[in-house]
């Protein structure tokens, strides 16, 4: 039932020993391991030296984050006040939030585009915005236009930062 034949190649202690004793094969393995370790060391040193450039690049990426309850749009964060305030109180409240009333200097292509946000996140209404006018008047934003309004009138407001 069982054969006494020897199958060459399956178990051959002489060949196995010959491979392990071959010093040139071991030298090649050491050289390859040395190359791998060397490239890893060079990569680590390079990353350590140029780490500041890596951080700078990440800081320049266009991802921005807004605080809770703020809306991000076009690299600007907006806060839509849901209570009515007169112009001065709205402006002061925005300052407490480390922001300003949305203004014509905000990095927004067109301030009236915020109306789309007001419809999405609040409701269509009049909003105080900061715009250069004479002393006792300011501008309210409504229906894609600017309208003069007395500063003592209470309206909703939009802060930006």
UniProtKB/Swiss-Prot annotation:
Induction: Expressed in the early phase of the viral replicative cycle. Expressed in the late phase of the viral replicative cycle. The keyword Coiled coil does not apply. Residues 1-30 are cytoplasmic. Residues 52-161 are extracellular. InterPro entries: C-type_lectin-like/link_sf, C-type_lectin/matrix_domain, CTDL_fold. Glycans are attached at residues 89, 98, 104, 110, 116, 130, 136. Gene3D superfamilies: Mannose-Binding Protein A, subunit A (3.10.100.10). GO terms for cellular component: host cell endoplasmic reticulum membrane; membrane. The keyword Disulfide bond applies. It is found in: Host endoplasmic reticulum membrane. Belongs to the asfivirus lectin-like protein family. This is Lectin-like protein EP153R. It comes from African swine fever virus (isolate Tick/Malawi/Lil 20-1/1983).
